[in-house]
Amino acid sequence: DYERTKTLSDQRARAAIAAGVPLVVVYPGVIYGPGELTEGNILVRHLLDLAHGRLPALVGKAERRWNYVFVDDVAAGIAAALERGAPGRRYLLGGENVTQGELYRLVGEVGGIRVPRLRMPDFLASASGSAMKGWARLTGGVPRLTPDLVEIYRHDWAYDSSTAAAELDYRPRSLRSGLETTVAWLREIGAWPA
């Protein structure tokens, strides 16, 4: 549903631009950082699962490249797009493109936690996701893994934010810096293990 609604909203925005509406569109990467611990804060929830040993194995191949962007950088990018963005332009507001292997190594270093080395094959992850989704329906909880999420893990999600950098002076922080801030916040609210 997430991808479908994103696609539909993008199509509507493009149609509005074509009709002369002065819109500026932004596309953030995978957003993380301090904020509500909701279903939408997927990376932070994932980090907490890692920190508390709730993930015996990692999903997705280590070489998959994703783009992670700190929440404050997205907010600054949106503000810059509102102030300086050219009507009709679309901007990718990303952070660093890193492999999943690099992400987990960095999470282990920054968070002082042991990260599993075992990788779950896609077919097993999909089956586990189906079971978790069914259990969540029965209990009213939020599944930690779903078949849709497993499908997302099967792809690269790397982006180039050079247009935003050139036109909006967009300068996101490093992944290490963002993770350090995020882990410090999680410690402060008592969610990260001591």
Predicted regions mapped to residue ranges:
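Short-chain dehydrogenase/reductase
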Residues: 1-10, 40-44, 64-68
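Conserved active-site helix of classical SDR/Rossmann-fold NAD(P)-dependent CH-OH oxidoreductases
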Residues: 7-14, 76
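Mid/C-terminal beta-alpha module of Rossmann-like enzyme folds, strongest
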Residues: 77-144, 161, 174-194
